[in-house]
């Protein structure tokens, strides 16, 4: 049953649950989510459920712990979900100070991940932080739980239930990690694959970096011009064996420079031009090669940030790829407003973007 937020200052958790037009489509998620919420309530955690975006008022979701639960129709659509996206985009900072998790229940094998990435990007740009691995995704067949089902000996539906309960706890328990550098300085690894003299993205990063100099130690690594090989797909045992030693079978710049810098860092900044509406090949290889290290080390206290510059459009698509790779898959924290997304085509035209110095300074201030 839907209740309002405004007069319930004791709420520990807000569940934003835009129901699909077909009530039967929500039955599977209802049967998993509602008992988990009742158990939390019995343990002293209050929650409020919102099913209609029209009930929200600016300020309702600021400073909250939030679960976004979305059920999709057979066609992969939930009309109320799109109203939710519109609300986030129309109300700047409406999620400031909030921490979120996402549950997507699909009716087919398609659309769940794409919808979750778009939701995460829009909510994040409105101020929502997402802890590492904030998504519980259930495809129509529950086939995406096959591996965990085999490992645990549980049925896919039981694995789904366990994942939802774990996500509730993760969102409620999340705390911001402290910087690990001397005197509280932030340790940042910036990764790029651009030519500094011609790259708008690098020019923008240089402006952002200026705003970080007094409180961060920054290591910059270039992975351009064939300095990095992509992942070749070793079996799990081989990958884990090398990862335990902070290495990868294929060696090179990844094991010599990137892995040590990443392990020491508090935050990674992806300096990322838009190539064909995608992360460029060398940066994609960098992401793929992190798998060996991820198998053996915990990245859940590290933050991911991005500077994305497009020649025409599509910066949101590239940002969503970074969310999928680092936040959904590699467990990095997605801080509020994690990406600075700009458009600049001709060389050095980023310098002519209105208020670019102010924007760069504001973004630098968000890197914590």
Model-derived features: where do they sit?
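Extended, H/D-rich, highly charged conserved domains that either
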Residues: 193-198, 222-224
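Flexible loop/N-cap segments at domain edges
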Residues: 254, 264-267
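Short, conserved beta-strand edge motifs with alternating hydrophobic and charged residues
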Residues: 221-222, 270-272
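Cysteine-cluster motifs in flexible loop/terminal segments that predominantly coordinate metals
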Residues: 226-259
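A general structural motif
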Residues: 224, 249-254, 284-291
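FMN-binding flavodoxin-like domain, especially the glycine-rich phosphate-binding loop
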Residues: 2-192, 196, 203-216, 259-264, ...
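Redox- and metal-dependent alpha/beta enzyme cores, enriched for Fe-S-associated oxidoreductases
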Residues: 207-208, 219-226
């Amino acid at each position: 049953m839907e209740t309002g937020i405004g007069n319930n200052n004791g709420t520990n958790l807000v569940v934003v649950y835009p129901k699909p037009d077909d009530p039967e489509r929500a039955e599977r998620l209802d049967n998993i989510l509602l008992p988990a919420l009742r158990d939390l309530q019995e343990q002293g955690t209050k929650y409020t459920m919102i099913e209609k975006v029209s009930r929200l008022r600016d300020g309702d979701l600021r400073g909250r712990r939030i679960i976004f639960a979305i059920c999709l129709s057979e066609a992969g659509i939930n009309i109320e979900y799109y109203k939710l996206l519109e609300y986030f985009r129309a109300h700047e900072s409406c999620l400031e100070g909030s921490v979120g998790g996402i549950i997507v229940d699909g009716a087919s094998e398609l659309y769940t991940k794409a919808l979750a990435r778009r939701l995460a990007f829009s909510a994040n740009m409105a101020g929502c932080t997402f802890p590492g691995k904030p998504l519980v995704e259930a495809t129509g067949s529950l086939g995406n739980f096959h591996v965990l089902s085999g490992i645990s000996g549980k049925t896919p539906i039981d694995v789904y239930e366990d994942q939802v309960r774990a996500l509730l706890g993760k969102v409620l328990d999340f705390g911001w990690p402290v910087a690990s550098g001397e005197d509280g300085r932030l340790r940042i690894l910036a990764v790029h694959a651009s030519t500094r003299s011609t790259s708008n993205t690098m020019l923008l990063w240089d402006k952002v970096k200026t705003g970080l100099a007094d409180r961060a130690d920054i290591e910059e690594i270039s992975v351009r011009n064939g300095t990095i090989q992509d992942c070749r797909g070793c079996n799990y045992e081989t990958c884990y064996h090398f990862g335990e030693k902070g290495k990868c079978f294929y060696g090179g710049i990844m094991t010599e420079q990137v892995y040590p810098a990443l392990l020491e860092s508090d935050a990674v900044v992806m300096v990322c031009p838009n190539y064909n509406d995608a992360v460029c090949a060398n940066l994609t290889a960098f992401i793929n090669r992190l798998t060996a290290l991820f198998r053996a080390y915990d990245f859940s206290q590290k933050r991911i940030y991005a500077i994305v510059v497009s020649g025409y459009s599509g910066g949101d698509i590239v940002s969503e790829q970074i969310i999928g790779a680092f936040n959904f898959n590699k467990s990095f924290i997605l801080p509020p407003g994690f990406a600075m997304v700009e458009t600049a085509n001709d060389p050095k035209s980023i310098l002519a973007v209105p208020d670019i110095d102010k924007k760069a300074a504001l973004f630098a201030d968000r890197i914590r």
